[in-house]
Curated annotation (Swiss-Prot):
Binding site for GTP 2: 183-190, 230-234, 295-298
Name assigned to this protein: GTPase Der
Complex and partners: Associates with the 50S ribosomal subunit.
InterPro entries per record: G_ENGA (IPR031166), GTP-bd (IPR006073), GTPase_Der (IPR016484), KH_dom-like (IPR032859), KH_dom-like_a/b (IPR015946), P-loop_NTPase (IPR027417), Small_GTP-bd (IPR005225)
Ranges in a coiled coil: none
Biological source species: Clostridium kluyveri (strain ATCC 8527 / DSM 555 / NBRC 12016 / NCIMB 10680 / K1)
Transmembrane regions listed in the UniProt entry: none
GN (gene name): der
Binding site for GTP 1: 10-17, 57-61, 120-123
Listed GO biological process terms: ribosome biogenesis
S-S bridge residues: none
Length: 438
């Protein structure tokens, strides 16, 4: 499989957020001011025994009365079942076994997903006896922890990564370019996938957030082999708006995590929204190849300036990813749909692009000659050598005299010049500056 996804499920106040933050190694409710990235993060990267994995917080909105706890837990468990490779089911050792715990355990058992049962708030040896009643859940041996004190987390993580070893891998999918179709409900993601597949494979409805499971579809074309990932719709019966949005974000994030290329779908009949910016912000932050598809183009009154007006309007909202190409389509009529795989292929090839070191240094030499670095703190930046150290996205290391001398405007100048010299349409590029050891 790719990077494993771990979902944390549990009743309100059992310690989900405490465990989430402890595994992430920091408090992450407020994140860095990266353009286009939501501040209400529901995911984080973690590592144990050389296993890198993603943890998902399914906490949602905590209900204020007991009447809605069980229905909320059902939704929470369903999201975990849909999106995660392994589930951490956390219960409260002090409070003991509850009806909500039993019902969710039954759902999790039926899913056949690997489950790690964690009994939290066991702060000392005297409280170890609290864990035994949780054997009745029938989902394996409970592991006692204290998330707040960090006790027992090593044993829990050992058990967790054992499940990674047992999980199947996605080697059979490695020859496929994975495409995630992301966007708000009802922008036409499922309609487009059906048009590309030539069959009614994904449930399509005019109701935003129509209930459906995430579906992977395999397709071979002249442009290559593709795996299409549709982001599952949110549960339309939920009455809690914030909870709907959070679960939708979780589903979208897991699709983005798996993808090579993300297609942000927008509705031509609506302005770009903050939710659109958040959705594509995930893909940008995770360094995925990105393209923007504007659907329902057949419903727009057009003249010769309409396309440029749309590009300008969208570009002002998505300025942090100006590298993404645009395609105006109609999934309903099929207008320009046949161009999608060609554009995906171009974005993916640029995402994997490797520049020879000699050519790269020749270009950088010319870039510096055209515009000398500014003086920063009485010192001028000197670039000794450049090499590419990675792809997906292309990543370049500059060996310099003093990494503190790189001004943000000159960094941007270098990136723009590299883009002018090499085609990086559809992909971000990363520039790192390291001081050369004498």
């Amino acid at each position: 499989m790719g990077k494993p996804i771990v979902a944390i499920v549990g009743r309100p106040n059992v310690g989900k957020s405490t465990l989430f933050n402890k595994l992430a190694g920091k408090r992450i409710s407020i994140v860095e001011d990266t353009p286009g990235v939501t501040r209400d993060r529901v995911y984080a990267q973690a590592e144990w025994l050389n296993y890198n994995f993603t943890i998902i917080d399914t906490g949602g909105i905590e209900p204020e009365n007991n009447d809605v706890i069980i229905s909320k837990m059902r939704r929470q468990a369903q999201v975990a079942i849909e999106t995660a490779n392994v589930i951490i089911f956390i219960v409260d050792g002090r409070e003991g076994l509850t009806a909500a715990d039993k019902e969710v355990a039954q759902m999790l058992r039926k899913s056949k997903k690997p489950i790690v049962l964690v009994v939290n708030k066991i702060d000392n040896m005297k409280q170890e006896n609290y864990i035994y009643e949780f054997y009745n859940l029938g989902i394996g041996e409970p592991i006692s922890i204290s998330a707040s004190q960090g006790l027992g987390l090593g044993d829990m993580l050992d058990k967790l990564v054992e499940n990674f070893k047992n999980e199947g891998n996605e080697d059979e999918d490695s020859e496929y370019i994975k495409i995630a179709f992301i966007g708000k409900p009802n922008v036409g993601k499922s309609s487009l996938i059906n048009k590309l597949l030539g069959e009614e494979r994904v449930i399509v409805s005019d109701i935003p957030g129509t209930t459906r499971d995430a579906i992977d579809s395999y397709l071979e074309t002249d442009e290559g082999k593709f795996l299409l990932i549709d982001t599952a719709g949110v549960r339309r019966k939920s009455k809690v708006k914030e909870e709907i949005e959070k679960y939708s974000v979780i589903r979208t994030y897991t699709a983005v995590e798996r993808a090579d290329v993300c297609i942000l779908m927008l509705d031509a009949t609506h302005d770009i929204s903050e939710q659109d910016e958040k959705i594509i912000g995930y893909a940008h932050e995770l360094n995925k190849a990105i393209m923007v598809v504007i659907n329902k183009w057949d419903l727009v009154d057009k003249d010769t300036k309409t396309v440029n007006k749309y590009k300008t309007s969208i570009g002002s909202s998505l300025s942090f990813m100006s590298y993404a190409p645009y395609l105006f389509i109609s999934a309903k009529t099929g207008q320009r749909v046949n161009r999608i795989f060609k554009m995906v292929r171009e974005c993916y090839d640029n995402y994997c692009k490797q520049i020879k070191t000699g050519i790269l240094n020749d270009i950088i030499g010319k870039i510096v000659m055209m515009k000398e670095p500014p003086v920063v703190g009485n010192k001028r930046l000197k670039i000794y050598y450049v090499t590419q150290i990675g792809t997906k996205p292309p990543t370049f290391v500059f060996f310099v005299n003093d990494s503190k001398c790189i001004h943000f405007s000159y960094r941007r100048y270098i990136e723009n010049q590299l883009r002018d010299s090499f085609d990086f349409t559809g992909t971000g590029i990363k520039l790192e500056f390291r001081e050369r050891k004498e």
